Regions:
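Residues at the starts of beta-strands that form the adenosine-phosphate
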Residues: 17, 45, 137-139, 170
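Glycine-rich phosphate/pyrophosphate-binding loop and the adjoining helix
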Residues: 152, 157-203
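Hydrophobic residues at beta-strand termini and immediately following loops
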Residues: 49, 142, 174
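N-terminal beta1-alpha1-beta2 submodule of the flavodoxin-like/Rossmannoid cofactor-binding fold
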Residues: 2-97, 102-117, 195-203
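Short histidine/acidic/glycine/proline-rich micro-motifs that form metal-
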Residues: 24-28, 146-149, 179-180
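Short, well-ordered alpha-helix to beta-strand connector turns
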Residues: 90-91, 136, 168
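Short, glycine-/small-residue-rich phosphate/pyrophosphate-handling segment
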Residues: 125-165
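Conserved nucleotide-sugar donor-interacting segment of glycosyltransferase catalytic cores
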Residues: 117-127
Length: 203
């Protein structure tokens, strides 16, 4: 099920489509709260994919065979490519995912596997190197961590995938860390990130 939400949050109209990939699990997610502050500043037309509601499936042998058959025919209209088409056509992308086990929730990896469709979001040169086909010029990655945000196996992976495989030239990390460590005020740390977004980002 493709979750779509369209909004106009900015006083200045923009025609760009911003895709919000929401990998947050909790209803009161701090990561989502920060991401929505960013979306409010970006404005324009927005579509949201709530990964927890997508029932994403791993790429089994049967699904891989089916996908290969379709891509070899150049048939990208099949419903199994709906999320990939949406990702490819977005002008700007915001991914929100908490920092879990030095990385991010498994559902985000499932999403990336499902949208990485050769011929749609990426292709390969004669030398075997990926060449991105995505329209987006920038990808934002929003995350929060209960402790220190190290090592970086989440944004670093997303950044490399975006630039080297999807053809998205610019990426930016927004993070709040130490949220569950005694002596740190989680609300203040989240509020500080939101204030930074409101002061620095605007169209």
């Amino acid at each position: 099920m493709l979750q779509i939400q369209m909004r106009v949050n900015s006083p200045e109209w923009r025609n760009d489509m911003i895709l919000y990939v929401n990998a947050c699990v909790r209803a009161d997610s701090r990561t989502d709260r920060i991401a929505r502050a960013l979306l409010e500043r970006l404005g324009g037309e927005q579509e949201e994919v709530r990964l927890g509601e997508e029932c994403l499936q791993p790429l089994s042998e049967e699904r891989l065979v089916r996908r290969t058959e379709l891509t070899e025919r150049g048939d990208y209209a099949d419903p199994m490519f709906a999320l990939a088409r949406q990702f490819q056509s977005a002008d700007e992308i915001v991914i929100a995912a908490p920092y879990w086990d030095l990385s991010f929730p498994a559902v985000l990896k499932l999403y990336l596997e499902n949208i990485y469709v050769t011929g749609l979001v990426s292709t390969y040169t004669e030398e075997g190197k990926p060449h991105g086909l995505c329209k987006a010029k920038k990808l934002w990655y929003v995350t929060t961590a209960g402790g220190p945000y190290v090592p970086d196996f989440s944004y670093g992976y997303i950044r490399t995938l975006a630039r080297e495989c999807f053809g998205i030239p610019e990426t930016e990390l927004i993070r709040a860390e130490m949220l569950d460590v005694q002596g740190y005020d989680a609300r203040e740390l989240v509020a500080r990130q939101i204030e930074m977004i409101r002061n620095r980002i605007g169209r």
